[in-house]
Regions:
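A signal for long, low-complexity, Ser/Thr/Asn-enriched, surface-exposed stalk/shaft
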Residues: 71-74, 83, 87-151, 192
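Residue-level detector of short, conserved catalytic/binding motifs and their immediate flanks
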Residues: 28-30, 88, 183, 193
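Short, solvent-exposed coil/turn segments at beta-strand boundaries
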Residues: 24-27, 84-87, 159, 207-209
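Short, surface-exposed beta-strand/loop "edge" segments at domain boundaries and coil↔beta transitions
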Residues: 37-44, 92-106, 169-171, 182-184, ...
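Surface-exposed ligand/attachment interfaces on beta-rich extracellular proteins
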Residues: 1-46, 72-80, 154-156
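Short, flexible beta-strand-to-coil junctions
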Residues: 8, 31-44, 52-56, 83-86, ...
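Terminal beta-strand-rich extracellular "head" domains
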Residues: 53-71
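Fibrous stalk/shaft segments of extracellular and virion attachment machinery
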Residues: 1, 133-178, 182-215
Length: 215
């Protein structure tokens, strides 16, 4: 592992490295310590950003680039430009004031990484670049929202499909079962709410009427 320092002053895109990534295959990693901003009492600025680059199998020719971010002040996006053959320029997007970051990098014996201590800057993503994939590593600092994990927020939301409490749901449709998979409530049409006990239709509530069935 090799360490150096880089400074990324503005908010935008920076060409932080040029890599040689032979096909079938090779791997390179770049890790940045520190993030956008340097304010005392702002622990999120002591950020970690990790780039993992992996060459393909030659069909098609190319690389995969992933950015793993651990803080809101870490790098935001990654992209690359294939300049020739197996050579690629690697770009990241990061916020302002990313000064004096520690950069560590490593690569397999058939690859090479040249890190740029004073990277070229662009306010926008290079037009001929390919976007990589960004993943957020959730922690006590970066907690997922309900939407991030496919949950409903405490303020409410829409559940698509049947709901069951303590069991599976045999009623299907827009229904709620409780404890027994065929005992509960089901919406069976516009304004129609049915009650089931052991899959027996017992009560129907509709506009202007309520019917007790099977009594």
């Amino acid at each position: 592992v090799t360490s150096t320092t880089i400074t990324l002053g503005e908010s935008g895109w920076f060409k932080i490295a040029t890599v040689v990534m032979p096909q079938a295959t090779s791997t390179a990693v770049i890790k940045l310590y520190g993030g956008a901003g340097f304010n005392a009492g702002s622990p999120e600025q002591a950020a970690i950003s990790e780039l993992v680059l992996r060459a393909g199998n030659g069909s098609p020719v190319g690389i995969t680039a992933t950015l793993w971010r651990r803080s809101p002040a870490a790098a935001n996006e990654v992209a690359w430009v294939n300049t020739s053959g197996d050579t690629y320029d690697i770009y990241i997007n990061i916020g302002q004031y990313a000064y004096w970051l520690i950069a560590q990098y490593d690569y397999t014996g058939n690859a090479n990484v040249t890190l740029h201590s004073t990277p070229e800057y662009s306010s926008v993503q290079p037009g001929n670049s390919t976007s990589g994939q960004t993943y957020t590593i959730y922690s006590s600092l970066m907690k997922p929202t309900a939407g991030d994990v496919g949950a409903l927020p405490i303020t409410g939301g829409q559940l698509n499909g049947p709901l069951s409490i303590g069991t599976d749901n045999a009623l299907g449709g827009n229904s709620i079962v409780l404890g027994d998979n065929d005992t509960g409530f089901k919406q069976n049409g516009d304004g129609i709410l049915d009650t089931y006990a052991n899959n027996q239709h017992t009560v129907r509530v509709a506009p202007g009427e309520m019917m007790v069935l099977g009594a």
